[in-house]
Amino acid sequence: MEQTSMGKDSSKTAIAKFVPDDDGVLKHTIKVHQQPTSATEKKGPSMIARSNDLIEEIQIKRRFGEGTKPLFERDDVKVNTVADGESISSKKIKSHKASSPSKGVNGLVKQNSPDVTQKFTKKYGSSENPDFRRHSSYEKDNYHKSNSKSGVHLEGHEGNYRPYFSDPIRERDRLRRLYGSPNERRSRSHSPSSNRRRSSHRSRRGSGSPRSRRYTSRHRRRSNSQDRTSWKHNPEHRTSRRSRTRSPRGNRSRRRSSTSSNEDDEREYRHRHHRSQERSYQNVLPTLPPALTNYPCHYHVAPMLALPGVQHRPFLPMVASVRHLPPQALYGGLAGAMPFIPMPMTAYRPHLGHRYPPPRHKINKKN
């Protein structure tokens, strides 16, 4: 029996041939196709083949003073060693000592001397006691520096340190407020950035304030006619009195400002109303007294303007004391048209439409 295996991608194919002992013809041939499972397809770290030559070439390099030392050394991974003097922590200590040698070096030596430690431990107990930190100058300085409000520690920086953001105008105003004369302490100059913020805030607010809104609406109202009876019910006035925002926080101040603006508007309207009453007769068109017509006063005349197809004919005569003719004014010398008033009809006429016709059967009659 002979076995041959062929590998294609991830599947494996095995062919088994059965050869008889004597030189006969091959009778059976078996072909086995094996499909790998999904578990073998997952490539983990254990399936990555690493040769010895590849392991020797692995070397991880770090930048200057980057990272910390590994917990344990590995034979297959080499890391470049950094001297203790070149580490970042030692640099911080060195810069702190160089910036303040009296406090840094001498203070540390004096603070850690056995005489000082015995003196403090006798008086305030061990260093774990909070009184020890309160009365120790070095610990107190470190405690206040760590709990500062600004959170920016400039101890480790050199002398040529420049902040990331500097505003010379603000710095000048701050120095004037601190050390200047009383007149200079009230500085009204603003930096370009603050001016930009103020202008954007004004443009965003627009005419939302009640004062500016009052002036603009007043100007709009003056441009229109001054003799308006429905001034309060005007939609323009309603929109000017309505609040622009709906925030619940500013309701109190907005109500106060709106009431003051409404009072001013009412006062101005009253003043303007009296003024318009005085000038009300200046713009009235001149008219003449009522003129007499050519027709007798006890005849009611059909209007020619309303019904031009109807001829001019008199209706039933009426007594002048019962129904008076309305006065006619002459506009430019032309007589006005007479209004057509139909005569009242008291008789019931079935061919005409009535609002309440009489009932045709007796429903309210009592037996």
From Swiss-Prot:
Signal peptide: none annotated. Residues 86-280 are annotated as: Disordered. Residues 130-144, 229-238 have a biased composition (Basic and acidic residues). It comes from the Eukaryota. Disulfide bonds: none annotated. Residues 109-129 have a biased composition (Polar residues). Residues 195-223, 239-257 have a biased composition (Basic residues). Transmembrane segments: none annotated. One of its GO terms (biological process) is female sex determination. Keywords: Differentiation, Sexual differentiation. Sex differentiation protein controlling female somatic sexual differentiation. May act by promoting the formation of a splicing enhancer complex. This is Female-specific protein transformer. It comes from Musca domestica (House fly). The gene is tra.
